[in-house]
Swiss-Prot record:
The lineage of its organism: Bacteria, Pseudomonadati, Pseudomonadota, Gammaproteobacteria, Legionellales. Its EC number is 3.5.1.2. It catalyses: L-glutamine + H2O = L-glutamate + NH4(+). Belongs to the glutaminase family. It is an enzyme of class 3 (hydrolase). Gene3D superfamilies: DD-peptidase/beta-lactamase superfamily (3.40.710.10). The gene is glsA. GO terms for molecular function: glutaminase activity. This is Glutaminase.
Length: 310
């Protein structure tokens, strides 16, 4: 099967094909997320050793990470504590339930099923070393490392998350009642809400998936930023759990490990080849970007980037 050349024209075609789909809507249960332009559709690709290519149908602005930010405590704690310790705090099994499921935690706890669920990310946030400001500095350190620059927290989104985050509070208290929360509920949730409220431009999102595609090495400098072991584990978790109870469908169609967020960002990885980020805030009931998935599937087919292809 021959693959196309990766060009701006191809990315433009992918965006225009995705624009034809009018399904989904912005995630209005976090009020600030409802204010974004729901027609925004964009893609950026960094192939290893090549220049970044990007295309957007509208002017770009910073968008919050939401659940793509769950990669930060996962990778940071893997690097600092190792897999054996991390798997004492959270399992790595696909859940088959929605990202904020309380039933799943109650039935199969006390460990959350995986780090990509809200319960899993909250459990990991409670294990961030230090107290108070030390924990926020830890987050800042790992944001700097995984995005190769500092990111800002959107204060309106942070306030919105805190004001409407009752289900996440319920998850945190349930974890606490099962002795699987390593810190105070309120302090842990502040870290979790901050994590979701970091905001980044499209090109800023591209560093992390490219880092994972390159076995943890900075593609420009060759510096080893993350261990190969951490990259291997992270990609396996993305491939099995990255889009919640739609991960199987995603992997069948694209063959790319990925992580989605309700803001519309999805990052995807083609190991040894490329890092990808797509953006469209029209999300489905499972919290995944509908147009984002259309673009990833089209890109995978055009470039023969499905992991199962020889």
């Amino acid at each position: 099967m021959s693959s196309k050349l990766l060009t701006i024209q191809l990315l433009e075609e992918l965006v225009h094909a995705a624009e034809l789909n009018q399904e989904g809507k912005t995630a209005d249960y976090i009020p600030e997320l409802a204010n974004v332009n729901q027609e925004l559709t964009a893609i950026a690709v960094q192939t290893l050793g090549e220049k970044t290519l990007a295309y957007s149908n509208n002017p770009l602005h910073p968008v919050t990470l939401q659940s793509t930010g769950k990669m930060i405590p996962l990778i940071g704690l893997l690097e600092e504590f190792g897999a054996d310790q991390l798997f004492e705090w959270v399992k790595v099994e696909p859940s088959g339930d929605d990202f904020a499921s309380i039933t799943r935690l109650e039935q199969f706890g006390p460990k959350p099923s995986n780090p990509m669920l809200n319960a899993g990310a909250i459990a990991l946030c409670s294990r961030i070393p230090g107290v108070g400001e030390q924990q926020f500095r830890w987050l800042e350190h790992w944001v700097q490392k995984l995005f190769n620059q500092r990111l800002s927290i959107n204060p309106l989104v942070f306030a919105s998350e805190k004001r409407t985050g009752n289900r996440n509070r319920a998850l945190a208290y349930l974890l606490k009642s099962r002795n699987n929360l390593g810190a105070d509920v309120h302090e842990t949730l502040d870290l979790y809400f901050a994590l979701c409220s970091y905001e980044a431009m499209l090109d800023q999102m591209l560093y992390l998936p490219t880092l994972l595609a390159n076995s943890g090495k900075d593609s420009d400098t060759g510096e080893q930023i993350l261990s190969m072991e951490t990259c291997k584990i992270t990609l396996a978790i993305m491939a099995t759990c990255g889009l919640y109870d739609e991960t199987g469908t995603h992997m069948v169609k694209t063959g790319m490990p990925a992580k989605s967020g309700v803001s519309g960002y999805t990052i995807a990885v083609v190991p040894g080849k490329a890092g990808i980020v797509v953006l469209s805030p029209r999300v489905n009931a499972k919290g995944n970007s509908i147009r984002g998935e259309i673009m990833l599937e089209g890109l995978s087919k055009a470039m023969n980037w499905h992991f199962a292809l020889p």
